[in-house]
Regions:
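A solvent-exposed, acidic/Ser-Thr-rich amphipathic alpha-helical stretch
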Residues: 36-108
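Short, low-complexity N-terminal intrinsically disordered segments enriched in polar/charged residues
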Residues: 1-45
Length: 108
């Protein structure tokens, strides 16, 4: 890999890192605002999606959606408004640890 290719590769990994930060920010914003229908749409929609909560484990996108939309509620659903009134959820994102793989294909 020459210097130009190495620099381009590094730039691509940095772009991926910023995209991940933006996705994490969207998750935090939408979930904190109880906009859980939109929040669920950010998930990968795969059979192996997995969400583990203190009250249960949800496997697959439909199960994850059920947890957030049906169990947590959504502020845009008139049936949920009274139950959500006065509730607040805060997600802090000040200790991020994001590792983009050297090949740029995965991250954790």
């Amino acid at each position: 890999m020459n210097d130009y290719e190495a620099l381009l590769h590094q730039a691509e990994r940095l772009e991926a890192l910023q995209e991940i930060r933006n996705l994490m920010g969207r998750y935090s914003y939408l979930h904190s605002a109880f906009r859980n229908k939109e929040y669920a749409e950010l998930w990968a929609k795969r059979e192996d999606d997995k969400l583990v909560m203190p009250f249960g484990k949800f496997v697959g996108w439909e199960a994850v959606r059920h947890c957030y939309v049906d169990l947590h509620g959504d502020r845009n659903n008139p049936d949920d408004i009274d139950e959500l009134r006065g509730l607040m959820m805060i997600h802090l994102m000040n200790t991020e640890i994001i590792e983009v793989a050297a090949d740029g294909k995965t991250a954790k």
